[in-house]
Amino acid sequence: MFHGGSSGDRANDAGRKISFRFGLGLALVAGLGVTGAARTEAADDVSFMRQVAPILLKRCSGCHGRRVSEGGYRLHAFTELMSAGESGEAAVVAGKPEASELLRRITASDKDLRMPQEDDALAAIEVALIKRWISEGARFDGRDPGRPLTSQLPPRQHPRSPARYPVAIPVLAIEFSPDGTQIAVGGYHEVTIWQARTGKLVRRLPKRPQRIQSLVWYRPDQILVAGGTPGEYGEVALVSAMSGEVRRVLGTFDDLVLGAAVSDDAKRIAAGSAGHETRGWSMDATQAAWESRVHSDWVTGVAFSADGRFVVSASRDQTLKVHDAASGALFTTYNGHRKQLGKFTGRFAVYAVSFDKRSKRLLSVGEGKAIRVWDPVQARSENGTAADMEGRFFKAGHTRFIPHGFSKATFGLDVHDGVALAGGADGVVREFSVETLETRRTYEGASDWVYAVAAAPTGALVAASGFRGEVLVWNRADGRLVTRFVASPGR
């Protein structure tokens, strides 16, 4: 399941060595701006992370972020902020605001020099905060000066959703409750809970990220919620399934979190983002146990192996990376979606991954005509070394293929007890046997792209959601449609 991505205003200004023009770049942090800063008492030092970083990220990172660096200057991390651009002029000189190019540019009267260009100047209180922070020694009060600032900022304070949605919104994530009687649905700044058989709204869990990409209802009273705002912000949090109380924000990201997972023993959590990043946590830890950036494109999904040994991340870069669940160390790379020989050849983005407890195999899917069924240990063995490259090229490999019959990309995948559910841009949901590789049933009724599929833990129901905001629930025994509803309160 995926949706989202990065954005940036890449206006061209090659003649300027350091510019701080406004762009719709990486994260801005709602609720942490100048209003709170204005309340800071004069006796207190200015906090870089709480007061200065949100201003710089909001107004400057579109042209000076990790992906775009006008004038050779970046400020997405503190070490980059403190470095000079192509001009060689120090952006920040600790204790000397008058010698700092950053302050000179944001206060310049010449419109060709003042930054951000082609946008309103920074407010006087914002300029004063930055100047005071430099005067006080330009101290860093985050965790790691080399890490992106957006991954270290305090979690956002999210707004409430409208009481009634003016329009239906796409539903990108669904999940059954452990007893199979309710369905959690990703909404706009909220998670909504519905009766599975009637489609009746039960309750709303408010003040969540703008877009909900992944839900894991792993115990009756708690849901793992992941999402964010495309190109700006990502978040993974543990939320009460009853009240919506946020019990813990595990981490923030510099882009949308597209997938999250909980290990079967509920001791570990993993997540992946559109910022090419994968992270792992211990359930009781306050910080991530590991972080990995081994993908070259969006991380679209993650899954744990049944024994908890591995975390597997799927990506638009056409690979799946197998990580050690405890340390994050790369165990192997699965290249089965870049197959060069045989029936299912091609190079395909991967949008979903799931683990089957019965066969102890991973299933992955995205573009292309088949679901891949494979094993991490065998994949590593087949990767071999450069010395046996020619031999490996002509080997069929251990991967098995489930022809899914879809003509377009597959976004949703859920696997339980030897049965795989999949759906995508064709607007159809199908059920497959992992053992026989055969199609067992087709669930019809979706009116547009399917983004997410889910099977009830009891095995009685299956569900799907998609672009038009509908959730459909079928009886698994006979494929009959039980209910369908627009999961937008008030619609």
Question: Model-predicted segments: where are they?
Answer:
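Bacterial N-terminal signal peptides
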Residues: 21-33
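Aromatic- and Gly/Pro-enriched helix-to-coil junctions and flexible linker segments
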Residues: 38-174, 178, 187-188
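WD40-repeat beta-propeller superdomains and closely related acidic/aromatic-rich repeat-like regions
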Residues: 141-491
